[in-house]
Amino acid sequence: MFYDQARIFVKGGDGGNGIVSFRREKYVPEGGPNGGDGGDGGNVIFIGDEGLRTLVDFRYQRHYKAERGEHGMGKNMHGRNGQDMTVRVPIGTVVKDAETGKILVDITCDGQQYIAARGGRGGRGNAKFVSSTNRVPLIAEKGEPGEEHWLELELKLLADVGLVGFPNVGKSTLIASVSAARPKIANYHFTTLEPNLGVVRIAEGQSFVMADIPGLIEGAHTGAGLGHDFLRHTERTRYLIHVLDISGSEGRDPLEDYDAINRELALYKPELADKPMVIAANKMDLPGAEENLARLREKLGEGAVIFPISAATRQGLEPLIYHVHKGLEELGPVVFERVTADAHMDVRFTGKTEERFKIHRDEQGVFVVTGKEVERHVAMTDMENEESVARLQRIFDVMGVDQALRDAGCQHGDPVRIGDLDFDFIEYAAQYAERDDDGENG
């Protein structure tokens, strides 16, 4: 099995910040808070597209970031939500977490959507923090950071185009010239023992997969050489390019080669003869090529589609590739096998309540608190605002973070880390005792 792979980074947009603002109008001495909320960040969304065949475009762009939400404004004005970023992927793409290798989703149908990175929630403005005990709140939340991940994309490659022909006619050179494939190339028969696959990129969003089918010999349909293995690969292609050594540099007659290969294809499976096929008259840069090309045209007549090329010098390759691409478009999209997602794919809810946070002590002796909820609260708190910090402390008390730190052995003055926040653990009883000692000594 052959796979196209890509590693990309996705990040949802950060939420916009809420703001602290108060109504200020003439004759309204107690206008009250009117700080608006920040907008939500946009999501990064994968969309299945039956028109795409490869992952080649992800080699040119690896980072995908959605737009962040706008900050809130006064007069209770809500910041605009960030725009989603849509990323089109071929049908059959499997998305994995790059760190764990866990399968996140299998894109199995056209139009299927998957949120690869969710945008952060917009922070609340101070108008949302009014209460009976706090009529003039000076608190506003920062926007929640958007999710970010490194992802592995994997796509099972099915060759659109197969190169057929005798050994040493230049198939490997041709596929190396029109794609990023780098097959082993040498001047002897059966250099290629396994199909070499290359992705031919026409333009952004337009590409196809070409397979260098190992060289055939007469009697291949009976299993001679590696005939059955080689011919089996041609069944999976939609379009064939018959590569001829038109110069006859191997001492064979290219016209006889043409008849022999077509005969082997028809004898193995008659329906192979019905596949669309063009002829690539290769090695036009060598002596004798022009004469043999004229003989071939005379033999096959005006209806034959022949492209004189030299894979070694890249002569005539562009017309051949564009003709094949147009032919594939006329054949229409491939009908893909629908894959049933495994139980571990794209699970939204398992019915199991996860721990709200975990605590461990790292090698430097720092108590590290991890958990999506606690890290979100830290990220959305303005650490320059005393009221916001006090509110964060109350949240931690309610969640039981302080008590859990004590249970883990954390003592007054020990270092603690939550997300990007580093601080020293403070036992308020000890803090007050220190203040009393300072007062007595003063």
Curated annotation (Swiss-Prot):
Q: What's a Gene Ontology MF term here? A: GTP binding
Q: Please list the residue ranges annotated as the Obg domain.
A: 1-158
Q: What is its EC number?
A: 3.6.5.-
Q: What class of enzyme is it?
A: hydrolase
Gene3D superfamilies recorded: GTP-binding protein OBG, C-terminal domain, GTP1/OBG domain, P-loop containing nucleotide triphosphate hydrolases
Task: Provide the residue positions that the database annotates as binding GTP.
Answer: 165-172, 190-194, 212-215, 282-285, 310-312
Identify which cofactors the protein needs according to its UniProt entry.
Mg(2+)
Sites binding Mg(2+) sit at: S172, T192
Q: Name one GO cellular component term.
A: cytoplasm
Query: Which PROSITE patterns does the entry link to?
Result: G_OBG, GTP1_OBG, OBG, OCT
The alphabetized list of GO BP terms reads:
ribosome biogenesis
> Which Pfam families does its entry note?
DUF1967 (PF09269), GTP1_OBG (PF01018), MMR_HSR1 (PF01926)
| Domain of life the protein comes from | Bacteria
Protein location:
Cytoplasm
Identify the residues that the record assigns to the OCT domain, covering every copy.
349-427
Domain OBG-type G: from-to ranges: 159-329
- What is stated as this protein's family in its record? Belongs to the TRAFAC class OBG-HflX-like GTPase superfamily. OBG GTPase family.
Q: What is the protein name stated in its UniProt record?
A: GTPase Obg
Native organism is: Heliobacterium modesticaldum (strain ATCC 51547 / Ice1)
Gene behind this chain?
obg
